[in-house]
Amino acid sequence: MKLLSLAVQDFRNLAQVELLPSPRATVLLGENGQGKTNLLEAIYFLTTLKPLRTARLAELVRHGAQTGLVAGDFDGPGGTRRVAVQVAPGGRVALLDGKPQERLDAYFDGLAAVCFAPDDLLLVKGGPEGRRRFLDRAAFNRWPAVLGEAREYVRALRARNAALRGGSPEVEASFRGPLVRAGARIVRRRRDLVEELAPRVSTAFREISGPAAPEARFAYRPAAGVQAEVGEAELAERLEHALAQRLERDRDRGFTSVGPHMDELVLALDGRGARAYASQGQQRALVLALKIAEIENLRAALGRPPLLLLDDVSSELDPTKNRYLLAYLAALPAQAFLTTTDRRLIEPAAGPDTAFYKVEGGMVSPLIS
């Protein structure tokens, strides 16, 4: 599915933007702080209904405005359709061909976007929360129903934590069932996705780093020893058992200490934890391999590559990895949006149909390439 046109109003620092992107590569040029990343976030928000950098919708609305709007025309196998999302401090409304959508299945049909930003380079050396976030965003792209499943889990988790802090045993017990059922679904999704991604991560890392590189391993480790290699019903039973074992500790501390919100992704090179033992170059190669694995997995599952959003990544990679990334993008039949402060970093991947835009002070204008 290709993005044919984009309209943005009162989103971050973007007052009003209309963009006709290239079917292949659209490059956004400008200094830092001018709105390049905001434009990428607008596209990401349109395709996922999730912001890139904040959990608060109010921060997405331009200062002084009441609401923001992002809309786009997409061309896919079923023809052209218009999707839009209105955002306000109190919430958001998704629209498909002008009609508000309560159920989002039709809205998300065919939409998938993978974003690669400098913060992603912290996936290896950062804490487990970032790795869980990566996996859950990738799972959402693979199975959009994950969005609703994650919300069910978060609701049950917050309610149980409140009951633990409030000293309400009966209320706490009433939320244990919904929590373990929703948690088991999340564990199953993560497990299935890691099984799909793991061999692709290993292959991509070897291609990036060369045949002499150590073997990259990507594995899922649920919290508290809950084994993921079972069916969903047994997963729920094991989660419930783990909760029962930790009940007194959870009551003392006022929060749930086991479940998908505490799980970990293991990244290792030749069996040694990458966070502690990998060099900076190896860590960045691993992150690049993770992103390429996600892209290739979606390409295989959907029959087409996802929309690609790359935020000033070339400036964060060494020349060898940047050449690999640009060569990969040039060979991939995908629509891509790239931001940079230095046009020379992107030029090797530019083709005759690459569109260049200048972004300055929240204004976007086309450049003659």
Curated annotation (Swiss-Prot):
GO molecular function: ATP binding; single-stranded DNA binding
Gene label: recF
Stored SUPFAM superfamilies: P-loop containing nucleoside triphosphate hydrolases
Primary location class: cytoplasm
General function of this protein: The RecF protein is involved in DNA metabolism; it is required for DNA replication and normal SOS inducibility. RecF binds preferentially to single-stranded, linear DNA. It also seems to bind ATP.
Listed GO CC annotations: cytoplasm
The keyword Protein biosynthesis is assigned to this record: no
This protein's record includes keyword Iron-sulfur: no
PROSITE patterns registered for this protein in UniProt: RECF_1, RECF_2
The family this protein is said to belong to: Belongs to the RecF family.
Signal sequence, renumbered to the chain: none
Matches recorded under InterPro entries: DNA-binding_RecF, DNA-binding_RecF_CS, P-loop_NTPase, RecF/RecN/SMC_N, RecF_2
UniProt entry keywords in alphabetical sequence: ATP-binding, Cytoplasm, DNA damage, DNA repair, DNA replication, DNA-binding, Nucleotide-binding, SOS response
Protein name: DNA replication and repair protein RecF
UniProt-annotated binding residues for ATP: 30-37
Compartments where found: Cytoplasm
GO terms for biological process, alphabetical: DNA replication; DNA synthesis involved in DNA repair; double-strand break repair; SOS response
Lineage: superkingdom: Bacteria
